């Protein structure tokens, strides 16, 4: 029995040390990586002594914002040894648990005498991460967190974090950022100058969206890259994260949302459409699916400001957070893409104050608190 206990104890300790050694290896590896990695600068400023949670669609540029912040910290005199960067999408961290987060901290402390600056990329993959994040903030660590679950924007998460973090929604590139990423400057009175490069760039942004990685892709490969991203990352993430069995129904739903960007959609109507293609689907299932898609930050919705409460909930207009995604499903996309692009800008600017109006007459966007009504038309026929 003593021999068995000795062997079991030895194995347990050995595995623990192996885990810590892996953590040390990743800490050092990531320090070297982020020091050398290029990035496309975003129009964002960080308060110097505040902790942040950056939330947005996968591949929307959250990691670039971390790299940018690391670069700025190094420029301000911080050492690369102070940076504790972890990307929880790393395959080597597939089975990581909440308790392992303390192990990472311990591994860092065995390597360096500095107080680390935590950069935790896609931490929502670790169940219970909020407790660890709050503890770090309570002990006055500087922490930057990214995640691709819209629940991280909720008041509940903010409360769990004790109000110690600034929670910021991260969108794909705006058109101005897209221009900057291509080193195109808008000069004064640019509309009267040779603006062919600007028009070409706008056409690219309009049809393929503003995901940062798309900037470096050749135009002939952009649609293929977006299709692979949607199928393998966005759609695949939905299936695995929420254990969805009716994958055909989910595919039809996303396509229908893209095809009906301009029209309000009820749960009943969507359930009927999906049921004709992918078998019987209940309204409750449609409501769940829509919530799942929103949680991945792929879509957002706005309500009719004049509707009764039940209609506000069940009869919304849905938009995609980036034009490249709906364009995968559209044959004649211009009218829908223009309204979607305007919706993105208004949602990024005004957030939950954005509505539509439908009471005998319809107005695409209504900002009641700001005294604005906005109608979007691609052509005179609209």
Locate each region found by the language model.
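Conserved lysine of the Walker
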Residues: 62-63
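Conserved P-loop NTPase "ATPase switch" module shared by AAA+ and STAND
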Residues: 112-129
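Short glycine-rich substrate-engagement loop in P-loop NTPases that contacts/grips substrate
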Residues: 84-114
